[in-house]
Amino acid sequence: MQIALVLLAIYGTTTTNTLRIDQCGENALGMQNGDIADSQITASSSFDKQSVGPQNARLHSELASGAWCPKPQINSKSYEFLQVTLNDTFLITSVETQGRYGNGTGREFASHYMIDYLRPGSQWIRYKNRTGHVYMDGNFDTTTPVIRVLDPPIVASRIRFVPSSKNTRTVCMRAEIHGCKHEGVTYYSTVPDGSRLDTLDFKDSMFEDSQIYTESGIKRGLGLLTDGFVAQASPFEKNQMNNSWIGWNRDTTDGRITILFEFEEVHNFTDVVLATFGNRIDGIDVIFSQDGKTFPLFSQISSSERQSLNNTSRRYDFRVPLHNRAGRKVRISIKFSSDWMFLTEVHFTSAANLTLLSEKIPPPSSAATQQLLVVCGIIFLTIFACVAYCVSVCLKRRQKNKSVDSNVKKDLIITHMGNKPTCHVFPSNGKLSNGHYEVANDILYARSQKSTLLSVSSKSTFSCRAIPPTWTDFNFPPPPEGREEHTYSQPVSPENSSNGSYKSVRKIQALKKYPSSALLIGKAIGEGKFTMIKECIIFGGLKCAHKSTKEEDCVHGTRALGDEIACLLQCGRHPRIVELFGVDESYNLLLEHVEYGCIRNFWMASEAPLDTEFLVRICKDIYSAMAYLESIRIVHGHFTPNNILMDGEFHAKVCSPRGPSHHAQLRYSAPESIVNNEFTHKSDAWAVATTVYEMAYQCRQRPYEELTNEQIVDNACALLDHQPNAVVPLMPTVFNYEILQLLTRCFRVDQLERPTFERLVKPFQD
């Protein structure tokens, strides 16, 4: 038996290995459609990685908060960038940008930007266009995509968008890149680099500032000879710009020039065409190198132009057949005898080189055949074992998911009560899975800022199917607006005091469930963003507050209820924390009814100012509740006056502990919460002290009353940077010295310098 072994070596179909822009088209490279993966999109910084990280900078996409936004504000001296790493070297013909629309919440865009790029073997290069400008005109609003054609185009494997602004401002971007794969020249160098004679300057004015050189010190890069533009007019015409031709004068060059072209890979070349201007080229020598170092003489091809009777200078193409010579570098030496020799473009063309090797091989022996069968059998068994293992793992996971579906009906939770308090929610983990935390002294930090978002059906069932986050899952818009209070979130799960996991299924099953027939639901007494609270009487006369979603199929409200119940189940009963009685058949919450509602409404309704003794007693109740939450490692996360309810005996109760995973009102948030999205017991200490500050003014003066939301964010940054112009609330002198000192320490920028709630509650108890 004879086996014919055929080796087919293909070096590529017929292609032009220089910039042929007309053949490239305007293909989008994948920012919008996802061909460019999230891992390929990075940035120098992000205001918040999840909501406005670089992965959200996709054109025409409303991911998370709608764009990439750098952490600092942008000015003319900034260097913040959005970087896209491509899988290969591409010819980039245009770029397209948008601002941050954020489904109507965004107002940020880049009016100007610069482009940096690199390719294999280069450093970062700042792009300049044919007229020498480096600034690109960007966007004028947040929605309209603006495309900018790159003239000359860019050859790059990585590209950076660098926003710039004359005035310091917040900037956000989305982007797309257009072009095609590049297989042509990656670098060239000329000796000499063009001639300058009197007022005539024909050097390569568009040559890249690549800062890379040959061994002999000649600068390497791309420029006029590979920009895809072929000039037709004479270089001496007055309206002809000198950035279309490179010219060499015979007197300054002795009529000899050398150009070295470099490619990423070895090519088989069929011809090279020189787009030139003059009366004749005396001779051309083309020599090839496959290893990039040696140029063997046997590879050299020489050509000359026929003598012409017409000595008039003209624009013409000079073609040299290259006979499928192989090379990674090509060196062209040109001789000319006219006064000037000009080039505007050099085109290489390569063609497929098919090498067929047919070789007769003797038939294998029986022993060799047996060995081959054994090897094939082992490979087959290995593949079969792997497939069987994967199938078994999938079946186990499916069974596990079914068991969870049958045990857990819905992820639940409560929010605060009172007259129209602010209520925001975040995407919760339906399974109430283990939180990941580290404890440093008495501070509870979340280690992971990512959460798996679990789908919740409209039929009160629970599913462990992971779904990707969308912009509605985040309430952390990076640039603050001046009209409404902003909220900030850190999507992680609260931690259990003992081992970091809730026994959620058992506790939910242990919750008392009341049938609808046993409930008499009355008028509304409060509402949040997705939830509402109504008066309710349970059969037997027990008065409570009925908490439900505003809309039946509101996923966000359902998640909010589920997240709050997780914290309340861990809290158990505490005299200063609102109690959870149970749920109804639809898993709406039945909460302790607190007679006078929110402390702010209570205080505003009081005809006469309340005395300091009453304020101290309220503070004692608050700090008692917060010290208990601290002891079981629950971070409240969004403390404001709306979270303090007044009962019939004029004691305060804290409601809506949500863990470090939820939102805080901007004016009550610690600087690390605003800037770094970090929520701990120490940030709670800041928020509670800010609430006490407002109560000390009878709830008639908001914190930072004179500052806009934008200025509050700037102030938080200034605090973290220890700038002297930063401000903090100044506590009024209505308390004794010890309490005043402790409350003042709550506004320390260094979290470790803030007192614990255990320490804060002591002077109020005394």
UniProtKB/Swiss-Prot annotation:
Membrane topology annotation: Single-pass type I membrane protein
TM spans (from-to): 373-393
Gene3D superfamilies tied to this protein: 2.60.120.1190, Galactose-binding domain-like, Phosphorylase Kinase, domain 1, Transferase(Phosphotransferase) domain 1
SUPFAM superfamilies: Galactose-binding domain-like, Protein kinase-like (PK-like)
Binding annotation for ATP: 525-533, 547
Subcellular location(s) per record: Cell membrane; Cell projection, Axon; Perikaryon
Signal peptide segment: 1-18
UniProt topological domain (Extracellular) ranges: 19-372
Compositionally biased tracts (Polar residues): 488-501
Cytoplasmic topological segments: 394-766
Region (Disordered): 475-501
GO molecular function: ATP binding; non-membrane spanning protein tyrosine kinase activity; signaling receptor binding
Domain named F5/8 type C: residues: 24-180, 195-351
GO biological process, one term: cell differentiation
Tissue: Expressed in neurons in head and tail, some motoneurons in ventral nerve cord, in PVP interneurons, pharynx and stomato-intestinal muscle.
Effect of deleting the gene: Viable. No effect on axon regeneration 24 hours following injury of D-type motor neurons. Double knockout with svh-4 results in a more enhanced axon regeneration defect of D-type motor neurons as compared to the svh-4 single mutant.
Listed Pfam families: DDR1-2_DS-like, F5_F8_type_C, PK_Tyr_Ser-Thr
Residues with glycosylation annotation: 87, 103, 129, 242, 268, 311, 353
Keyword terms: ATP-binding, Cell membrane, Cell projection, Disulfide bond, Glycoprotein, Membrane, Neurogenesis, Nucleotide-binding, Receptor, Repeat, Signal, Transmembrane, Transmembrane helix
GO cellular component, one term: axon
Domain spans labelled Protein kinase: 519-766
Family statement drawn from the similarity comment of this UniProt entry: Belongs to the protein kinase superfamily. Tyr protein kinase family. Insulin receptor subfamily.
Entry note about domains: The protein kinase domain is predicted to be catalytically inactive.
PANTHER family referenced in this protein's UniProt entry, alphabetically: PROTEIN KINASE DOMAIN-CONTAINING PROTEIN, TYROSINE-PROTEIN KINASE RECEPTOR
Annotated function: Receptor which, together with svh-4, is involved in axon guidance to establish the tracts for the ventral and dorsal nerve cords during nervous system development. May play a role in axon regeneration following injury in D-type motor neurons.
Stated name of the protein: Discoidin domain-containing receptor A
Species of provenance: Caenorhabditis elegans
Gene name, Swiss-Prot/TrEMBL: ddr-1
